[in-house]
């Protein structure tokens, strides 16, 4: 379920352009994934519980131009992230392409504000300074002021390009053990 932005094995309704998570387990991916000879999809159950899976794959057998980019995705986890260490979202990407988006399943281990980590994009040989440097995670995701609305609460939202669609909590702001799912797509960048 990580591929369809359902971190923590808990549903979080989401209405975006490439991914939709709908009521009662509807998880839909609309990413274009061209292939020239064959394609393989693998599902892995990381629990000891049996799962019932229903799926539909829509494809067409057409010629794919030589300059058509492939779809690549990376998954990795740091639990917990070392203090003051940068969390790398995409590593060692080479060649021509477009970065299309980020999904973060974020767990909080302290009673402090967790979203001030700036998002940095080191591109095209950047070393010391990134081409893009943001002001905080909540700003990168499309929110502001710690996603607080109404006062004293986090606010779920889901838009075509960004959202904080999962809030798994003890109640209130800045509480340890809260978990969040959030995304940002760069489809028009």
For the regions a language model picked out, list residue spans one by one.
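Beta-strand-centric surfaces of beta-sandwich/beta-rich domains
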Residues: 1-189
């Amino acid at each position: 379920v990580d591929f369809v932005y359902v971190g923590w094995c808990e549903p979080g309704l989401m209405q975006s352009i490439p991914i939709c998570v709908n009521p009662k387990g509807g998880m839909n991916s609309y990413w274009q994934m061209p292939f020239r000879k064959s394609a393989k999809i693998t599902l892995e159950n990381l629990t000891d519980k049996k799962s019932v899976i229903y799926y539909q794959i829509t494809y067409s057998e057409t010629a794919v131009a030589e300059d058509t980019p492939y779809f690549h995705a990376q998954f990795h986890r740091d639990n917990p992230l070392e203090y003051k260490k940068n969390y790398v979202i995409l590593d060692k990407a080479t060649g021509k392409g477009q970065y299309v988006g980020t999904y973060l399943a974020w767990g909080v281990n302290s009673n402090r504000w967790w979203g001030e980590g700036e998002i940095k994009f080191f591109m095209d040989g950047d070393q010391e300074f990134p081409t893009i440097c943001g002001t905080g995670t909540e700003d990168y995701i499309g929110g502001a002021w710690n996603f607080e609305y109404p006062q004293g609460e986090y606010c779920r939202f889901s838009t075509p390009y960004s959202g904080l669609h999962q809030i798994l909590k003890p109640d209130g702001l800045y509480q340890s053990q809260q978990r969040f799912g959030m995304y940002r797509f760069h489809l028009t960048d």
